[in-house]
Amino acid sequence: MTTSYMNGHVTEESDSGIKNLGLASPEEHPKHREMAVDCPGDLGTRLMPVRRSAQLERIRQQQEDMRRRREEEGKKQELDLNSSMRLKKLAQIPPKTGIDNPIFDTEEGIVLESPHYAVKILEVEDLFSSLKHIQHTLVDSQSQEDISLLLQLVQNRDFQNAFKIHNAVTVHMNKASPPFPLIANVQDLVQEVQTVLKPVHQKEGQELTALLNAPHIQALLLAHDKVAEQEMQLEPITDERVYESIGHYGGETVKIVRIEKARDIPLGATVRNEMDSVIISRIVKGGAAEKSGLLHEGDEVLEINGIEIRGKDVNEVFDLLSDMHGTLTFVLIPSQQIKPPPAKETVIHVKAHFDYDPSDDPYVPCRELGLSFQKGDILHVISQEDPNWWQAYREGDEDNQPLAGLVPGKSFQQQREAMKQTIEEDKEPEKSGKLWCAKKNKKKRKKVLYNANKNDDYDNEEILTYEEMSLYHQPANRKRPIILIGPQNCGQNELRQRLMNKEKDRFASAVPHTTRNRRDHEVAGRDYHFVSRQAFEADIAAGKFIEHGEFEKNLYGTSIDSVRQVINSGKICLLSLRAQSLKTLRNSDLKPYIIFIAPPSQERLRALLAKEGKNPKPEELREIIEKTREMEQNNGHYFDTAIVNSDLDKAYQELLRLINKLDTEPQWVPSTWLR
């Protein structure tokens, strides 16, 4: 399946309302089609030879002659040394005794290779001091001029860098080769030895037979053969047809990539069509292509296993690769785009504030790689290289999701939501004489993320998309306040009161403030904080109250300091608040844990209220359900979790479990809380 490759870029022509926002209309014909295909790693490149100048060629020839002479001198010395040592050993060898085993006789034709001759590495300082010495030795003006020219060259930074590279290559080329297995069938050789030893009754032969039959030796031989078999496998020789086909593409730089394609390993790449070309469009995190680092966006695929790809549709390429396994040979034209090396990206964790289904998204560049999620899910974003389409994993699916999925980038999603709202507003009929009023009301109905420092500032509104999160484990002596929120008659007050009654030593309520006079049985600081109206209004202006209201001409409210006093005492503060108070509380330093108490179905809610002796009307039940939807839509981004109160006892146990989990497991909180 393929989808339009919009990639969120600005298009020249689009429908009204879309052009200004830089988004292509879903009805437009796509410029590109992007398809996810397998593309394993183990990649390699082959470059065309570099043309040398005549002067460089002469220098190279002189260096080659000097190297050849040094090799001949070294081999001559080595041969003389080997001959001398062999004569000495032959003179010291005693006559053979015991069993004549032809298998272990040293073949005369085998000469063990000695390590490469040592190469003395000159440093720039050595070269400079030698030239200085020569300069003092020579007296004629021409020689002095030549030496001065050489000294200037040696002091040049580019020459010094090239000299260091030369030394590094020389050291690498003269390193001894790693050990290479002589044979890959030691087990067969051991069986032959055991066959030879069968008729032997001497103690040494029987001891060798027992040793070769020991389980550890057998396991060692098996491991040796497995490793040797892999080491001795020759790399498949590139088919001559591949090199012949390169000539068909003129003077273009071509690279050949050989891939071992497994059936169960995702390769993580997408391709798109550009005219007749098939272009690698995207490298997906987690796939073999990304891990290899050798396959790049913008590479053009010319051939796969000798099959020409130019002119094929991405669907044909997908079908072709789905039937191919084993060794695949790709002929590619490298991308001409010059990109800076990618910086090491850090994973960011975000909480989604909207639902997303890629199957309903006409803008997703590759629907097969789209990652669906729901409001409240935690996403681990591992790549923002494409600002319009992030690559991410969903929390809990990392092990089952080998490849990262595509999710809308924050700015792209904000543009899209703004476009939708603009279109919806344009479609609404505007009544004559009420234009400004209508626009004002529409603006207030928008779902916005408020500025933390300006609670009522509509000019700083931001469409809800993602919120960066971090893990936080509450300290044992500083518990997070538990906030219960929900529509009336949904049980949040009953749950709060049950917790307070059953575990008084663990839970406490914040002492509210009031402006009314103290009654005889009330204790200041225990029942209420009694303050003057002037002081209360000053605290309201200073933003010290989480929520407040007026009843019978007296002000009542819960302050941030009252909640902090409960936290400092080591207890868990329990609050039941209105939805309008959540923003102020969340923007404080209290780190609240907000639990939404949702009602069950309408019929179940009627039964629960009937048990309490209440007989609500149908319209009252519908109002509760509608209020629930409204609270979830407007304030759901504040909720940490939700409990459906279909049974008060079960809801109480679930509430207690969630509170206990805060002591044992870290929770996701806004990153701004920890900065």
Curated annotation (Swiss-Prot):
Residues 1-32, 52-79 are annotated as: Disordered. Residues 479-660 form the Guanylate kinase-like domain. The keyword Nucleotide-binding applies. It comes from the Eukaryota. Its main location: Golgi. InterPro entries: GK/Ca_channel_bsu, Guanylate_kin-like_dom, Guanylate_kinase_CS, L27_C, L27_dom, L27_dom_sf, L27_N, MAGUK. GO terms for biological process: central nervous system neuron development; cerebral cortex development; establishment or maintenance of epithelial cell apical/basal polarity; establishment or maintenance of polarity of embryonic epithelium; gene expression; generation of neurons; morphogenesis of an epithelial sheet; myelin assembly. Residues 345-417 form the SH3 domain. Residues 120-177, 179-235 form the L27 domain. One of its GO terms (molecular function) is ATP binding. ATP binds at residues 486-493. Residues 21-140 are annotated as: Interaction with PARD6B. It is found in: Golgi apparatus; Cell membrane; Endomembrane system; Cell junction, Tight junction. Keywords: ATP-binding, Cell junction, Cell membrane, Cell projection, Golgi apparatus, Kinase, Membrane, Nucleotide-binding, Phosphoprotein, Repeat, SH3 domain, Tight junction, Transferase. It holds the Pfam family L27_N. Residues 256-336 form the PDZ domain. Residues 1-345 are annotated as: Required for the correct localization of PALS1 and PATJ at cell-cell contacts and the normal formation of tight junctions and adherens junctions. One of its GO terms (cellular component) is apical plasma membrane. The modification Phosphoserine is found at residues 14, 25, 83-84. Residues 54-79 have a biased composition (Basic and acidic residues). Belongs to the MAGUK family. The L27 domain 1 functions in targeting to the tight junctions by binding to and stabilizing PATJ. Heterodimer with MPP1. Forms a heterotrimeric complex composed of PALS1, LIN7B and PATJ; the N-terminal L27 domain of PALS1 interacts with the L27 domain of PATJ and the C-terminal L27 domain of PALS1 interacts with the L27 domain of LIN7B. Component of a complex composed of PALS1, CRB1 and MPP4. Component of a complex whose core is composed of ARHGAP17, AMOT, PALS1, PATJ and PARD3/PAR3. Component of a complex composed of PALS1, CRB1 and EPB41L5. Within the complex, interacts (via HOOK domain) with EPB41L5 (via FERM domain), and interacts with CRB1 (via intracellular domain). Plays a role in tight junction biogenesis and in the establishment of cell polarity in epithelial cells. Also involved in adherens junction biogenesis by ensuring correct localization of the exocyst complex protein EXOC4/SEC8 which allows trafficking of adherens junction structural component CDH1 to the cell surface. Plays a role through its interaction with CDH5 in vascular lumen formation and endothelial membrane polarity. Required during embryonic and postnatal retinal development. This is Protein PALS1. It comes from Rattus norvegicus (Rat).
